[in-house]
Curated annotation (Swiss-Prot):
This is Acyl-lipid omega-3 desaturase (cytochrome b5), endoplasmic reticulum. CDD domains: Delta12-FADS-like. Pathway: Lipid metabolism; polyunsaturated fatty acid biosynthesis. It is an enzyme of class 1 (oxidoreductase). The lineage of its organism: Eukaryota, Viridiplantae, Streptophyta, Embryophyta, Tracheophyta. Residues 1-28 are annotated as: Disordered. It catalyses: a (9Z,12Z)-octadecadienoyl-containing glycerolipid + 2 Fe(II)-[cytochrome b5] + O2 + 2 H(+) = (9Z,12Z,15Z)-octadecatrienoyl-containing glycerolipid + 2 Fe(III)-[cytochrome b5] + 2 H2O. The chain crosses the membrane at residues 53-73, 210-230, 234-254.
Length: 383
């Protein structure tokens, strides 16, 4: 086992601290994934199309009601409240479409595909394109090279990036606006587009699926353009555009926090050290306060990553049942108040210090570029 821990002071967390606590999160777990599966109650695996559709109905009704109320009152005092609320619901709709992509929505593939296309196209997400890349993320979670979402940059790639690109990636809130760019261009060091049927993201057999989803996405975009001419662009921006930006910020923040920002530095793997189980155990549960229910318990992320076929409405029970097997490999999330303000601190702190991982070693930890913000500060002084 090779652990890349050069320049120890630049590594988030300290191996000495882990040894003092008697626990190393990068050590082989003493249990197998079958042990976790056996601990989860049978009812947690049952999918109910009616129950899943009830959440879709709830969210669509809430989105429509909010939009009608905002247009009716048309008050600049209320618009900011509407934007936050509606953007939050757009994120909830995304989560339901995400469930369709995993097949946890129902055991009926056609229903999953139809509902998934409707939900994701509405918020300008190419359903199959994202579904397939997200499947890659789950199949390779925690792998430095093969993971798909918020992948750590190897040191050589990081240091070859223009300084402006590094600043864009590691200056809050800019990373929280990355999702549309990711859909078109993926992450640094990776090629392909979620809209192109011939992208390296997809197998030849998946090209028709990608074309279908890109067509649905295009229809939604054309509808928004048409409404801009039919009504006026400012109204479309207020009713849809700003909530879309809030949704993107929710998506980027939540997906980042599920894989970064824990108080204890967590490992990433390569080569023979990686396994599906070890990669899944590097994910993090989060408590989103009042948003837990609104966002369909997306914060129960560890069990979701290991068993994505479990419906979201059973994830709390499944997590509770699996904790005794996971032991210290499960990191109990900090209890949130009504509004999860504490997560903002975790997000900002992680982005400021989790910059790259070593080019070598099968178990690596994030390291910090001590000159990233110093360079920017010195340059501003010169100017």
């Amino acid at each position: 086992m090779v652990v890349a821990m050069d320049q120890r002071s630049n590594v988030n967390g300290d191996s000495g601290a882990r040894k003092e606590e008697g626990f190393d999160p990068s050590a082989q777990p003493p249990f197998k994934i079958g042990d976790i599966r056996a601990a989860i109650p049978k009812h947690c695996w049952v999918k109910s199309p009616l129950r899943s559709m009830s959440y879709v109905t709830r969210d669509i009704f809430a989105v429509a009601a909010l939009a009608m109320a905002a247009v009716y009152f048309d008050s600049w005092f209320l618009w900011p409240l509407y934007w936050v609320a509606q953007g939050t619901l757009f994120w909830a709709i995304f989560v339901l479409g995400h469930d369709c992509g995993h097949g946890s929505f129902s055991d009926i593939p056609l229903l999953n595909s139809v509902v998934g296309h409707i939900l994701h196209s509405f918020i300008l997400v190419p359903y199959h394109g994202w579904r397939i890349s997200h499947r890659t993320h789950h199949q390779n979670h925690g792998h430095v090279e093969n993971d798909e979402s918020w992948v750590p940059l190897p040191e050589k790639l990081y240091k070859n990036l223009p300084h402006s690109t590094r600043m864009l990636r590691y200056t809050v809130p800019l990373p929280m606006l990355a999702y549309p760019i990711y859909l078109w261009y993926r992450s640094p060091g990776k090629e392909g587009s979620h809209f192109n049927p011939y992208s390296s993201l997809f197998a030849p057999s998946e090209r028709k699926l990608i074309a279908t989803s890109t067509t649905c996405w295009s229809i939604m975009l054309a509808t928004l353009v048409y409404l801009s001419f039919l009504v006026d662009p400012v109204t479309v921006l207020k009713v849809y555009g700003v909530p879309y930006i809030i949704f993107v910020m929710w998506l980027d923040a939540v997906t980042y926090l599920h894989h970064h920002g824990h108080d204890e530095k967590l490992p990433w793997y390569r080569g023979k050290e990686w396994s599906y189980l070890r990669g899944g155990l590097t994910t993090i549960d989060r408590d989103y306060g009042i948003f837990n229910n609104i966002h369909h318990d997306i914060g129960t992320h560890v069990i979701h990553h290991l068993f994505p076929q479990i419906p979201h409405y059973h994830l709390v029970d499944a997590t509770r049942a699996a904790k005794h097997v996971l032991g210290r490999y499960y990191r109990e999330p900090k209890t949130s108040g009504a509004i999860p303000i504490h997560l903002v601190e975790s997000l900002v702190a992680s982005i400021k210090k989790d910059h790259y991982v070593s080019d070598t070693g099968d178990i690596v930890f994030y390291e910090t570029d001590p000159d990233l913000y110093v360079y920017a500060s010195d340059k501003s002084k010169i100017n």
